[in-house]
Amino acid sequence: MARLSLDDVISMALTLLDSEGLEGLTTRKLAQSLKIEQPTLYWHVRNKQTLMNMLSEAILAKHHTRSAPLPTESWQQFLQENALSFRKALLVHRDGARLHIGTSPTPPQFEQAEAQLRCLCDAGFSVEEALFILQSISHFTLGAVLEEQATNQIENNHVIDAAPPLLQEAFNIQARTSAEMAFHFGLKSLIFGFSAQLDEKKHTPIEDGNK
């Protein structure tokens, strides 16, 4: 029998994730699918949280193609492309957003995280502001994908018909608007807000503490 590799474990775990969802993805089921005993699996995966971290890292490494800024793009362009790429990666597999929540950058991702911070700091943001901007983009993207991947969509026409006029119109707009379109609107608004804050910061006179 060929020796089990980490790639084999990750590949089978992603298959289980797509078929069973995050709740159904357990180390017991994974071991059964790999036709091995659980103690053998522990050589690669100690527990479910470790497995989730591994899967999240593997998904981003393969599908999140714009995690680092390009030398020729503005910080605004980077934030937009980064968020769109992140969203696309989260949507590749079932429960992708839930899988990613609670994870932190790992050593292989440190260089990219540093480049992201540097891109914003070079534009005039402080390290604290750069961190909050990246967190805001990440949280917005995760929340949007969580909503998109959820199954509790409003499908009851009786509920919609009973709504007051503005809410009814909003429901109708939501029904004919793609999640991607709504995401673009929110992302554009966030970046516009960051730009306004930076402009205000650059044009605010520095008070002389000696006066």
UniProtKB/Swiss-Prot annotation:
The keyword Secreted does not apply. PROSITE patterns: HTH_TETR_1 (PS01081), HTH_TETR_2 (PS50977). Residues 3-63 form the HTH tetR-type domain. Residues 26-45 bind DNA. GO terms for molecular function: DNA binding; metal ion binding. GO terms for biological process: negative regulation of DNA-templated transcription; response to antibiotic. Keywords: Antibiotic resistance, DNA-binding, Magnesium, Metal-binding, Plasmid, Repressor, Transcription, Transcription regulation. TetR is the repressor of the tetracycline resistance element; its N-terminal region forms a helix-turn-helix structure and binds DNA. Binding of tetracycline to TetR reduces the repressor affinity for the tetracycline resistance gene (tetA) promoter operator sites. Mg(2+) binds at H100. This is Tetracycline repressor protein class E. Tetracycline binds at H64, N82. InterPro entries: DNA-bd_HTH_TetR-type_CS, Homeodomain-like_sf, HTH_TetR, Repressor_TetR_C, Tet_transcr_reg_TetR, Tet_transcr_reg_TetR-rel_C_sf. It comes from Escherichia coli.
